[in-house]
UniProtKB/Swiss-Prot annotation:
The gene is aroQ. This is 3-dehydroquinate dehydratase. CDD domains: DHQase_II. PANTHER family: CATABOLIC 3-DEHYDROQUINASE. One of its GO terms (biological process) is quinate catabolic process. It comes from Synechococcus sp. (strain WH7803). It holds the Pfam family DHquinase_II. The record marks R17 as: Transition state stabilizer.
Length: 147
């Protein structure tokens, strides 16, 4: 099984950007922990981060036929990007939306996601552990494990 971890704008600043909201772990810390989990689960994990919408769309296109599932934290593009939504729908790869903060407890413009209604699930509000929960959920879904 192959998964793609896709992170959008400003996620590269984790650990520095508003640590009271997003925590002190860096993106590298999160990726390392998920790589360990993936290894234990016999899953291959690819990672990609970009601050550019077009690069994220292009990476989703490249994933077609090469990955079984996508974990995506689209950052601010969650609330604005029809292009990213269309790319995810176009490749028809199951995906889970993930956020460190609870987007529903923040500013009203963050309450709407252009991805959530087509995602297998959405995990938010648990800091860096949101990624672990999303990983477990996606792997279990792809393996046909019922809750």
């Amino acid at each position: 099984m192959r998964l793609l971890l896709l992170n959008g704008p400003n996620i590269n600043l984790l650990g520095q950007r508003e640590p009271g909201l997003y925590g002190h772990q860096t993106l590298s810390d999160i990726e390392l922990r998920l790589r360990d989990r993936a290894s234990e689960a016999e899953v291959q994990l690819e990672t990609f981060q970009s601050n550019f919408e077009g690069a994220l769309v292009e990476r989703v296109h490249q994933a077609m036929g090469s990955v079984d599932g996508i974990l995506i934290n689209a950052g601010a593009y969650t609330h604005t990007s029809i292009a990213l939504r269309d790319a995810l729908l176009g490749v028809a790869i199951p995906f889970v939306e993930v956020h460190l903060s609870n987007i529903h407890a923040r500013e009203s413009f963050r309450h709407h996601s252009h991805l959530a209604d087509r995602a297998l699930g959405v995990v938010c509000g648990f800091g860096a552990f949101s990624y672990d929960m999303a990983f477990d959920g996606l792997v279990n879904h792809l393996r046909g494990v019922e809750a």
